[in-house]
């Protein structure tokens, strides 16, 4: 958090036009540490305020709404606590929002960079996935004129949109308040912009259980937004392609229960003698898409060295299969309207191999889903054995992906849980309940930005 406060205080922007708020819901010594850092910068002429809440009403959305009510700026920049915005962030985003032709632009989303992409195989896989999302998916949606979402951090909002009664401001009825707000804004005529050339690096979770928690929240929140906005989205006077793409975007995590269902029905189908080889052979052509997506993203970012991170695609595939059980639970909870608290993703300020997160008090403990993953991994191996004995060898490689994915989740989860067992936890790097964001309120433009490539 102090790292973020330092970065915001050093943004290249006139200090009389810059107001920094640290939105703090923590319940430990984090508040005192952040207040000390804020006082340090106030003594140097920077407006920094710590807004601490005793009750986490509305979680992140509630904290952002409270911050907005006390802000004076025309524009609101939002950064999660683990991000480090570059000094020129505002000079490259504010002028775009102030151009006369961009009066309807509600928000600007920068590309997420990575502070620790090479920390481990897990962070390399996540970096590969995030690069594909921003460089291909976000850029592609913008180029096609489709609706796209605000990612919750490293972005800039126009206050007029946040206070537009047609939009409704920050709402806490989903776990993805950022995605919810950006879709509601675009459905009443506001627009968004994605700037690939403006990069704000953030920390990638180095712990598998923290990554699972993050994915669970994103999966549940996205489906909550789908359930909330799908009827309204379908009634928009937009081209059919844009409406369909919006529904597919909001429902992207529905793939996980479908993956789980596919595994479960495979064994009964094999025992019944079903042979769906040819239909699946044609459908399998779609599997070419994801490798191309990630290859294009790495080629765009790293040129001739694109293949070095793309080589982690098999591990990323295993992760995706292994997440299907946990994320299916998230989808089910969203569809059945089960409320759960906002569980933040702990970050540990580790950047290079050898730096330790395992002794942090905020390491995520082992959760019961690991036993479900163990059972499903065994089920997948049994299904592979049945496929081989029945001569259905074509299905074995696909089923082995499930076994490898669940096995990876179980073994890595158990190993990291043992490394982070309570007796070894002595260091504190972050707050248990600090919201993901720290907003910066801005009152006006400074200079013109560099033109984005897209």
Enumerate the language-model features and the residues they cover.
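Short, well-formed alpha-helical segments that are part of the catalytic scaffolds
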Residues: 1-10, 62
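Active-site donor/metal-binding and catalytic loop motifs
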Residues: 3, 196-210
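Acidic donor-binding segment of Leloir-type glycosyltransferases
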Residues: 6-56, 98
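The conserved acidic donor/metal-binding loop of glycosyltransferases
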Residues: 26, 80-84, 185
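Long helical/loop segments within the catalytic core of UDP-sugar-dependent glycosyltransferases
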Residues: 38-74, 87-175, 180, 186-187, ...
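Catalytic donor-sugar/metal-binding loop of nucleotide-sugar-dependent glycosyltransferases
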Residues: 182-201
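Loop-to-transmembrane boundary segments
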Residues: 235-258, 349-381
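Membrane-embedded multi-pass helical conduit in multi-pass membrane proteins
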Residues: 252-341, 366-436
């Amino acid at each position: 958090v102090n790292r973020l406060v330092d970065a915001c205080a050093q943004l290249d922007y006139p200090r009389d036009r810059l107001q920094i708020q640290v939105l703090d819901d923590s319940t430990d010594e984090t508040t005192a540490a952040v207040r000390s850092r804020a006082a340090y910068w106030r003594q140097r002429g920077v407006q920094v305020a710590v807004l601490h809440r005793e009750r986490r009403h509305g979680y992140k959305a509630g904290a952002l709404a409270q911050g907005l009510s006390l802000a004076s700026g025309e524009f609101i920049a939002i950064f999660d606590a683990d991000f480090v915005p570059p000094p020129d962030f505002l000079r490259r985003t504010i002028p775009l929002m102030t151009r006369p032709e961009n009066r309807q632009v509600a928000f600007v989303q920068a590309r997420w960079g990575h502070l620790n992409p090479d920390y481990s195989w897990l962070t390399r896989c996540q970096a590969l996935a995030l690069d594909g999302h921003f460089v291909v998916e976000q850029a592609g949606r913008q180029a096609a004129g489709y609706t796209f979402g605000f990612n919750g951090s490293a972005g800039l909002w126009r206050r007029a949109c946040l206070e537009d009664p047609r939009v409704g401001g920050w709402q806490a009825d989903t776990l993805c308040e950022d995605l919810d707000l950006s879709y509601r804004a675009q459905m009443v005529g506001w627009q968004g912009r994605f700037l690939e050339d403006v990069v704000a690096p953030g920390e990638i979770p180095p712990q598998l259980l923290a990554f699972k928690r993050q994915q669970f929240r994103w999966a549940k929140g996205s489906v909550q937004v789908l359930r909330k906005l799908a009827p309204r989205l379908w009634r928009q006077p937009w081209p059919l392609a844009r409406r369909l793409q919006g529904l597919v975007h909001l429902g992207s995590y529905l793939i996980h229960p479908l993956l789980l269902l596919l595994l479960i029905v495979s064994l009964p189908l094999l025992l019944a003698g079903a042979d769906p080889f040819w239909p699946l052979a044609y459908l399998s052509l779609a599997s070419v898409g994801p490798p191309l997506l990630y290859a294009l993203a790495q080629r765009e970012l790293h040129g001739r060295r694109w293949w070095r991170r793309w080589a982690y695609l098999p591990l990323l595939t295993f992760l995706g299969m292994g997440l299907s059980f946990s994320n299916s639970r998230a989808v089910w909870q969203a569809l059945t309207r089960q409320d759960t608290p906002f569980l933040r993703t702990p970050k540990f300020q580790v950047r290079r191999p050898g730096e330790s997160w395992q002794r942090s008090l905020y390491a995520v403990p082992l959760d019961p889903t690991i036993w479900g993953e163990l059972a499903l991994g065994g089920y997948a191996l049994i299904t592979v054995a049945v496929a081989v004995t029945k001569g259905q060898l074509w299905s074995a490689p696909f089923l082995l992906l499930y076994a490898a994915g669940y096995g990876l989740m179980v073994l890595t989860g158990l190993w990291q849980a043992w490394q982070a067992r309570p007796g070894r936890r002595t260091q504190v790097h972050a707050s248990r309940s600090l919201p993901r964001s720290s907003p910066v309120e801005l009152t006006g433009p400074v200079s013109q930005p560099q033109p984005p490539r897209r």
